[in-house]
Amino acid sequence: MSASRGAVIWMTGLSGAGKSTLANALHQRLMEAGHAAIVLDGDVLRRGLNADLGFTPEDRTENLRRIAHVAALFMQQGFVVIAAVISPEHRHRCSAREIVGDGFIEVFVNAPLNVCEARDAKGLYARARRGEIPHFTGISGPFEAPLAPDVVIESDRMPVDESVDRLLAHLAAMGRPGH
């Protein structure tokens, strides 16, 4: 696969919206079709590459800047990069798009807050509501819905397989690895 054929699928949405589930399902389908693909999961990266960062506005900006640069490096090698990151602010997503350049696809994985809370197996929303987690996106921290995402996935209404099909079709329409 040529370097010009890589892409970065930047999945944004609240915690519990289904970003990681969708990212892993898309990754599996891409790999089965013989495409080079990688998932950059925000939670995983925060435990490793970005373990030195907290959740202050400055640290969130740096976290997403690093992820965008890593994503761009993989894309330049022809990978389809699936970044599953909350990226709560419009400016963060604009910055990521600028860093990545051509091949950036913003995907809004949307689900109502009550659905995200119901899916929360770790109890993070409950802890945030008790004030135990400051700056928690959607509770004590803002989430700015994307203004013009390339793709919107309503994860509470659309099955994962159908969502993957929609993303693969979008990739194919862009001339990127897909079907």
From Swiss-Prot:
Q: Where is the active site?
A: S87
What is one cellular component GO term in this UniProt entry?
Answer: cytoplasm
Pathway involvement? Answer: Sulfur metabolism; hydrogen sulfide biosynthesis; sulfite from sulfate: step 2/3
**Keyword field contains Oxidoreductase:** no
Asked if the record carries the keyword ATP-binding, the reply is yes
The record ties this protein, via CDD domains, to: APSK (cd02027)
Q: What is an example of a GO molecular function annotated in this UniProt entry?
A: sulfate adenylyltransferase (ATP) activity
Which reactions does this protein catalyse?
A: adenosine 5'-phosphosulfate + ATP = 3'-phosphoadenylyl sulfate + ADP + H(+)
Q: Which GO terms describe its biological process?
A: hydrogen sulfide biosynthetic process; sulfate assimilation via adenylyl sulfate reduction; sulfate assimilation, phosphoadenylyl sulfate reduction by phosphoadenylyl-sulfate reductase (thioredoxin)
Indicate the enzyme's highest-level EC class.
transferase
Please indicate which superkingdom the organism of origin belongs to: Bacteria
What does the record give as EC number?
A: 2.7.1.25
Which residues participate in ATP binding? G13, L14, S15, G16, A17, G18, K19, S20
Q: Give the record's keywords alphabetically.
A: ATP-binding, Kinase, Nucleotide-binding, Phosphoprotein, Transferase
What Pfam families does this protein's entry cite?
APS_kinase
Which InterPro entries does the record match to this protein? APS_kinase (IPR002891), P-loop_NTPase (IPR027417), Sulf_AdTrans/APS_kinase (IPR050512)
Q: Which PANTHER family does the UniProt record give?
A: SULFATE ADENYLYLTRANSFERASE (PTHR42700:SF1)
Protein family:
Belongs to the APS kinase family.
Q: Function, please?
A: Catalyzes the synthesis of activated sulfate.
Q: What is this protein's name?
A: Adenylyl-sulfate kinase
Please give the organism: Paraburkholderia phytofirmans (strain DSM 17436 / LMG 22146 / PsJN) (Burkholderia phytofirmans)
